[in-house]
Swiss-Prot record:
Interacts with MKS1. Interacts with SIB1. Interacts with VQ10 and CAMBP25/VQ15. GO terms for cellular component: nucleus. Residues 217-242, 277-303 are annotated as: Disordered. The lineage of its organism: Eukaryota, Viridiplantae, Streptophyta, Embryophyta, Tracheophyta. Disruption phenotype: No visible phenotype under normal growth conditions. This is Probable WRKY transcription factor 25. Induction: By salt stress. Induced by heat stress. Belongs to the WRKY group I family. GO terms for biological process: cellular heat acclimation; cellular response to heat; response to cold; response to osmotic stress; response to salt stress. Coiled coil: none annotated. One of its GO terms (molecular function) is metal ion binding. Its main location: nucleus. Zn(2+) binds at C191, C196, H219, H221, C353, C358, H382, H384. Residues 229-240 have a biased composition (Polar residues).
Length: 393
């Protein structure tokens, strides 16, 4: 190609440069061969000169090509970093490259090391505090540190009440009634310990489940140590076809009458108030004192009995199925009275041991629920053995 002067370049027309565009050809794929060479007449040099390379900025030394491939927008969620759109945790780096948080221009929000501990601190502690607020402080005080002789009223919620309401103390039921503010009947109990004024109210549902217990007054004594009740296997066997029973061989105990029991049932104490709900409203105050009751029984037999207040003889109740009313137990008895009590149409007979100096008594009556069942209540303990004449027979 011949050299061309600067004057020729200025004289050439822009149209002439492109009039033979069909003769242009591309040589190779490099930038040097991108512009065609003219055949025939010469092509201006500035049209054949290679253009300078494009300015490409260098990437940061902290980034590699694999870092771009690890972008959350290019890869699946299994290789992506945690973000508002993916929500996943980072795995191992792409192509074996491991990246640190300091290598990235953005910083990830730190997550708690133990999610379960965070939840426990948020919810577990709050739930524990709520339960502590629901449990009355007086309940723990009553079980561990008794405040003797103090008047207080404690209401226990339903979720803390056990089915048999056994709290370690001896209780005697003296009444039951239906209150307006509750659909369940309420039973009233008094502590059996002498001179103790503590009482409790037990609310029971129709299915037998205890729904509420209310304590009134504090105990002025520690919890009694109960002895084990005699099992049915320890009852005396029959002699000459007749069933014998010796109350002196049985260790009686105070008991909670909220528990169902056919062996021990303080039936005589229910005379005054246990069935008053069928005839009228119940007064929550205790019935006449024990001393007055025993004096009344002593007047029936024509003799005076002086009993110190607070002394209560043990009671044992035996239920048998028999056609006869009197239970043959080996001792001699003398009948001194009979009457009909409320709640039972069958009469109750009163007997006293004929041995000189023995104050044991018994009451015999048929059950109101079952006419064949005979209830024999023994009060006191014999201070003598079975008479010899009866023992030989």
């Amino acid at each position: 190609m011949s050299s061309t002067s600067f004057t020729d370049l200025l004289g050439s027309s822009g149209v002439d440069c492109y009039e033979d565009d069909e003769d242009l050809r591309v040589s190779g794929s490099s930038f040097g061969g991108y512009y065609p060479e003219r055949t025939g007449s010469g092509l201006p040099k500035f049209k054949t000169a290679q253009p300078p390379p494009l300015p490409i900025s260098q990437s940061s030394h902290n980034f590699t090509f694999s870092d771009y491939l690890d972008s959350p927008l290019l890869l699946s969620s299994s290789h992506s970093l945690i973000s508002p759109t993916t929500g996943t945790f980072p795995l191992q780096g792409f192509n074996g490259t491991t990246n640190n948080h300091s290598d990235f221009p953005w910083q990830l929000q730190s997550q708690p090391s133990n999610a379960s501990s965070a939840l426990q601190e948020t919810y577990g502690v709050q739930d524990h505090e709520k339960k502590q607020e629901m449990i009355p402080n007086e309940i723990a005080t009553q079980n561990n540190n008794q405040s003797f002789g103090t008047e207080r009223q404690i209401k226990i919620p339903a979720y803390m009440v056990s089915r048999n309401s056994n709290d370690g103390y001896g209780w005697r039921k003296y009444g039951q009634k239906q209150v307006k503010k509750s659909e369940n009947p309420r039973s009233y109990f008094k502590c059996t310990y002498p001179d103790c004024v503590s009482k409790k109210i037990v609310e029971t549902a129709s299915d037998g489940q205890i729904t509420e217990i209310i304590y009134k007054g504090g105990h002025n004594h520690p919890k009694p140590e109960f002895t084990k009740r005699p099992s049915q296997s320890s009852l005396p066997s029959s002699v000459n076809g007749r069933r014998l029973f010796n109350p002196a061989s049985v260790v009686s105990e105070p008991h909670d009458q909220s528990e169902n029991s056919s062996i021990s049932f303080d039936y005589s104490d229910l005379e005054q108030k246990s069935f008053k709900s069928e005839y009228g409203e119940i007064d929550e105050e205790e019935e006449q004192p024990e001393m007055k009751r025993m004096k009344r029984e002593g007047e029936d037999e024509g003799m005076s009995i002086e009993v110190s207040k607070g002394v209560k003889e043990p009671r044992v109740v035996v239920q048998t199925i028999s056609d006869i009313d009197v239970l043959i137990d080996g001792f001699r008895w003398r009948k001194y009275g009979q009457k009909v009590v409320k709640g039972n149409t069958n009469p109750r007979s009163y007997y006293k041991c004929t041995f000189q100096g023995c104050g044991v008594k018994k009451q015999v009556e048929r059950s109101a629920a079952d006419e064949r069942a005979v209830l024999t209540t023994y009060e006191g303990r014999h201070n003598h053995d079975i008479p010899t004449a009866l023992r030989r027979s």
